[in-house]
Amino acid sequence: MTSSPLAVEPPTRRAVVFIAGGGTGGHLMPALAIAEELRRKRPDLEPVLLGAQRGLEATLLPQRTFRYHLLPLEPIYRRQWWKNFRWPLIALNVRRELIRLFETEQPVAVIGTGGYASGPCVWFAARRGIPTAIQEQNAFPGIATRQLSRMVRHVYLGLPEARARLKLGRETQVFDTGNPIIP
């Protein structure tokens, strides 16, 4: 059977790259800068942002042109530590949502930029063998970066002195790249 010359090819789906981070502008703005650059340099890839329902991203992402998903996350409380007793339930809900997102979106890579949305997303991807990376903006890496630096493939540092505070995996590669910014 031959196809009609008027037959339209179905649109090809671009490969998805999750960029997870937020909570504050210090984590969200680098995520947006990476997404912009990825869109510009790799039109074959679609950056999809992952953040928290309670973070700054809940306000800023609807104003952007990127697809995004907001997860039912809360920060790890340091001063009001008793609020952390909710974390088992939060973790269960986030895990369910990540299973759904990873099955429907099928990301080819996950990049974390820190903040409480970054940790679960990068960890989930690394456990499934999906290529992972972290971009750390600070000289003193945050909790997510310090914990995940053992299991990710690449760590991109905004400041080279952060390297001394990381415990890296045997195959983790570290790059001093500076911090991504939105012009």
Please provide the spans of the model-predicted regions.
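Conserved nucleotide-sugar phosphate-binding/catalytic loop shared by glycosyltransferases and other
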Residues: 14-24, 44-93, 97, 172-180
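Positively charged, low-complexity intrinsically disordered leader regions
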Residues: 2-11
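Active-site-proximal region of nucleotide-activated glycan assembly enzymes
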Residues: 126-183
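Short amphipathic alpha-helix
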Residues: 27-38
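Glycosyltransferases and closely related glycan-assembly transferases
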Residues: 97-110, 118-133, 146-151
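Residue-level detector of alpha-helix initiation sites
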Residues: 23-25, 115-117, 139-140
